[in-house]
Structures are given as structure tokens and as C-alpha cells.
Curated annotation (Swiss-Prot):
Negative results: shows low activity at hNav1.8/SCN10A (EC(50)=2.6 uM) and hNav1.9/SCN11A (EC(50)<1 uM). Does not exhibit hemolytic and cytotoxic activities on HEK293 cells. It comes from Pogonomyrmex maricopa (Maricopa harvester ant). Coiled coil: none annotated. This is Myrmicitoxin(1)-Pm2a. The keyword Cell division does not apply.
């Protein structure tokens, strides 16, 4: 089963959200011009934005779970055929 791309994006965004909040210093919430943001947090935010943009740019495969769904829909018919021909013979 394929995991949706949006789930990967959500995990990356949630995992890095702690470092993203460090980009604005909490000691000065009004944005003092002399206060420098953390360069590591800025780099992390840029990398996260780039990863999300790349993930959204890739085309999504059309119906990746279709073979699995087809198999699951045929299971009752297979069960009926096995019971009719092999078990109740």
C-alpha cells in the first residue's frame, strides 16, 4: 500500500516546526531590527519549503491501489467458489 504524499509533507512540517519557530526570537516579539534570526532555523525553513515544493511537483500515480482493490472485491466470489467446489463438493 502506498502512503499518500501529503502524509510525508505533514510529517516533515510537524517534525521541523520546532526549529521553524526559532526563526523569530521569542524574547523580542515585536521584531527589533537589531535582533538576528537563527541562521540554522532559516536554512531548515528553506529546506522544508524546497522539499514540499519538490513533493508537490511530482505527478501522483493514477490509482496505485487498483490491483489491491480488484483482489479484495473478488475475495467473496473466490470464497464462494472454494466452498462450493472443494468443501461442500
Amino acid at each position: 500500500m502506498e502512503i499518500p504524499k501529503l502524509l510525508y509533507i505533514a510529517v516533515i512540517a510537524i517534525g521541523l516546526s520546532g526549529s521553524l519557530t526559532c526563526a523569530t526570537p521569542l524574547a523580542n516579539p515585536w521584531g527589533d531590527p537589531e535582533a538576528e534570526a537563527n541562521p540554522e532555523a532559516k536554512a531548515t525553513a528553506e529546506a522544508t519549503a524546497e522539499a514540499i515544493a519538490e513533493a508537490l511537483a511530482e505527478p501522483e500515480p493514477a490509482l496505485p491501489a487498483l490491483p489491491l482493490l480488484m483482489f479484495l472485491f473478488t475475495l467473496p466470489a473466490l470464497q464462494h467458489w472454494i466452498e462450493k467446489n472443494w468443501i461442500n463438493g
